[in-house]
Each structure stands twice: as structure tokens, then as C-alpha cells.
Design a protein with these regions (language model features):
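Active-site cores that bind ATP or allylic diphosphates and position pyrophosphate for catalysis
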Residues: 1-39, 46-48
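Non-cofactor substrate-recognition interfaces
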Residues: 28-39, 45-263
Length: 263
């Protein structure tokens, strides 16, 4: 339908995904200061709990940057596309970071594993490794795409090709469901299969967000100025030292032509 996409101003987040140090990733740790992270940007932080992969571009050049986390001041090293370094490390910041000379092509990272960003629910299958995606660009973001197979056609396609499991929950009827139900909220714990919850869900961490709507427009009980789920997730990541940049960003977002609400 015409007019279904509209420009909206939302909270965006560049998240830090901690690289697992093992035989596959060891060479990327040479000379690293602090922890090593992949940086990935999203305009929909509410999808981050459903992340199961990161995608790099097949022909994109990547570099490591020694820096400090902007919110915690912890020394760290981050990986992002060389072309996008100026978007995150400006001339005003000179002296606080070091871009390394060594350049890596995207496929060199294929198979490298990272820690789950928000371990609320564990996936039922192989996840949390870097894959190559043919649609990854350096138009914006970091040149590394956060993959949530349950919330994007491209994400689902490349994840399937790479054998990456989507993050499903199992409801009381025994059906696999995305973490967000048809009304636009995270499933409540009591709506999920108890055996699944016991085995795969961290009730303490997930319980804080269970039942929350991903868009405030769907919750009539909220005040107009109530913080959004996107904001709360970004703030939680910031406090945990897992966010690199949080900002407002204007982007095109689909809206229902009947209700005029975001989908």
C-alpha cells in the first residue's frame, strides 16, 4: 500500500559483540589491548535479543582500532569496516584511538565466534559466529550486520545458508515462535512451554522485559513520553559496556496502512 513507509526518529545502537578467543580467532588477538569486539549498528535495538549471527561483506576491508569504550572508558580493540572508521573516530578524537595498518577481508572472519550479546534465551542450534552476507554494504553502520533471522528476510536467507539457528521460543501449544508475538510484544514467561523455559530461558534476565511491546504505540497504558524498549535495551547495553554509540536516527520504517501504527 502507498504511504506504508514513513520517516521516523528512533534510538539506534552500535553494539559491541565480544570475540571468543580460540584457535579460529587467535590471529586476530595479536597485539590486542583489552577485549576484542565486533561493532554492529542497528536501527531496531529490540531485535538484538534475537541476534544469532554477524554478517561481513565478501569484498569489504576491515581494520582493528585500539580505543576506549566511550561510556566505561575501558581499553578495548574493535573491528569495523575501514571505510566507516571516520564515522566513529573523528578528528576531534585524535590521540584517543589508533587505527591499525593491517587490513582484513570479510571472509577472513568467517566462522569466528562471539559471545551472545543479550543471553535472555538460548537458541536451539548453532549460533553466534560470523558469516558472509552478499548484501552487507558500507553505506552506513559499521560494515558488519547484526543478524536476527526471525525478523528479516535477508537475515533469514543468509543464516539458513550458513546453518545458523534462528532464535525461537516455544509457546504453550508447543509451537516455535519468534520472541515477539503477533501483538508486538515479547512473549510473557507464562505463555511459554515450562520445559523450554527451564532449559533455554534465563528467567531473571528475560523476565525484566517479558511482556514489553517493541513499539510504544501498541501499549495504550504508556505515557507519551515513556521510554521505549529500544532506549531501555540500549541503556542496559551501555551500562554493561556493550554499547559503543547510542543516538537518535531518522530512518524509514513500515507502518500499518489500517491503524497507522509502526509494525
Amino acid at each position: 500500500q502507498p504511504g506504508c513507509y514513513r520517516d521516523v526518529k528512533d534510538t539506534t545502537c552500535t553494539a559491541q559483540f565480544r570475540v571468543v578467543r580460540d584457535e579460529r580467532s587467535e590471529r586476530f588477538f595479536e597485539g590486542v589491548e583489552g577485549e576484542l569486539y565486533f561493532l554492529a549498528w542497528t536501527t531496531t535495538p529490540w531485535t538484538l535479543p534475537s541476534n544469532t549471527a554477524l554478517a561481513v561483506g565478501p569484498a569489504i576491508d576491515y581494520v582493528r582500532v585500539k580505543c576506549r569504550n566511550p561510556y566505561t572508558d575501558e581499553a578495548q580493540t574493535v573491528i569495523l569496516a575501514r571505510e566507516l572508521v571516520p564515522s566513529y573516530f573523528t578528528k576531534k578524537m585524535e590521540g584517543t584511538f589508533e587505527v591499525e595498518d593491517r587490513v582484513y577481508k570479510g571472509p577472513e572472519f568467517e566462522g569466528v565466534r562471539y559471545e551472545q550479546l543479550l543471553p535472555w534465551v538460548r537458541p536451539m542450534g548453532d549460533a553466534f559466529r560470523v558469516i558472509v552476507g552478499d548484501y552487507v554494504t558500507t553505506t552506513d553502520g559499521t560494515g558488519i550486520v547484526h543478524i536476527a533471522p526471525t525478523f528479516g528476510a535477508d537475515d533469514n536467507r543468509v543464516a539458513k545458508q550458513a546453518g545458523i539457528a534462528p532464535l525461537f521460543v516455544i509457546d504453550r501449544a508447543g509451537k516455535e515462535q519468534p520472541m515477539v508475538d503477533r501483538t508486538g510484544k515479547f512473549f510473557r514467561i507464562e505463555e511459554l512451554d515450562p520445559a523450554f523455559v527451564e532449559r533455554y530461558v534465563d528467567a531473571g534476565k528475560y523476565g525484566e522485559y517479558a511482556g514489553r511491546y517493541v513499539k510504544n504505540a501498541y501499549d495504550d497504558t504508556l505515557a507519551p513520553d515513556a521510554p521505549t524498549l529500544d532506549v531501555d535495551i540500549a541503556v542496559a547495553l551501555k551500562g554493561a559496556g556493550m554499547a559503543f554509540k547510542i543516538e537518535k536516527h531518522v530512518h524509514s520504517y513500515p507502518h500499518c496502512w489500517r491503524t497507522d501504527k509502526p509494525v
